[in-house]
Amino acid sequence: MRDRAHADTLLFALGNAGRQDDGLGWAFAEAAEARGFPPENIHLRYHLQVEDAERIASAGRVIFVDACREPLPGGFEVRPCEPSASFPFTTHAVSPEAILFVCGEIYGRCPEATWVLITGESWDLGEGLSDTAAKNLDRANSAFTSTPR
């Protein structure tokens, strides 16, 4: 069943499923689609690019999901994501905050944004999540499904 509540929400899942727990973002997106999140609103990325700002600027809301190395309470964290003019000296690591800043500067609007970070522990080449990452993913998915729309 299609989830109409998320019709104007974009989900940007960041990571690399070929590097174990770095695939947490993509696994979260897969679960969201299974729950009815519109597949055309799900974007899998190895990393964000400045070009993503155009698509993001037209959304009502955007959710960024990524793995992190930091041990977070409960294994994951959901936090507001605000625009920031801080850009690294590489296009390989453009942050969600920087993309939101570009949205505001170029397109004159910036959607409400949330960042979901999920703790992982294994980053070697290979597919599949560690047991710890899989548990943290389950916790994050549970919070996502119980969050009011």
Model-predicted segments: where are they?
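N-terminal catalytic or cofactor-binding beta/alpha core of small enzyme domains
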Residues: 1-120, 127-139, 143-149
